[in-house]
C-alpha cells in the first residue's frame, strides 16, 4: 500500500531535470534541435521539449556553461557544481573528461574571485 502511494513521488524524484538532459546531450555531442526536441524529451518521460531546447541552446555556449551565477550567491554556486556532478555521473566514461574539466574551471573561477 505504501509503495502505491509513493510510486508517483519516487518516479518524479528519479526523473532527470531538463537542465541535466540538456547538458548530457551537449557533452555526448547529440544536438537538441527544434526538430528533435520533443522526441528527446519523451525519451526522458517529459511531455514537451520546448524548455529542454532552451536549456540546450543556453548550455551550448561555453561562456554560459562556465559562468559564475550573477548575482552571485554561495547557494547558486553550489547548485551549479551539483548540476555538473550529477551530469558527470550520467555520462559514459569516454565523454566525462570535458565536463570534469569545465567543472574544475568553474571551481577555479570561484576560488580566484574571493567570494
What are these regions (language model features)?
Residues 1-39, 43-46, 50, 68, ...:
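Acidic, serine/proline-rich, intrinsically disordered low-complexity segments
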Residues 62-81:
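Accessory, usually C-terminal, subdomains that scaffold auxiliary metal cofactors
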Residues 39, 54-58, 71-75:
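Helical anchoring/docking segments at protein termini
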Residues 49-66:
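Major-groove recognition helix of helix-turn-helix-like DNA-binding domains
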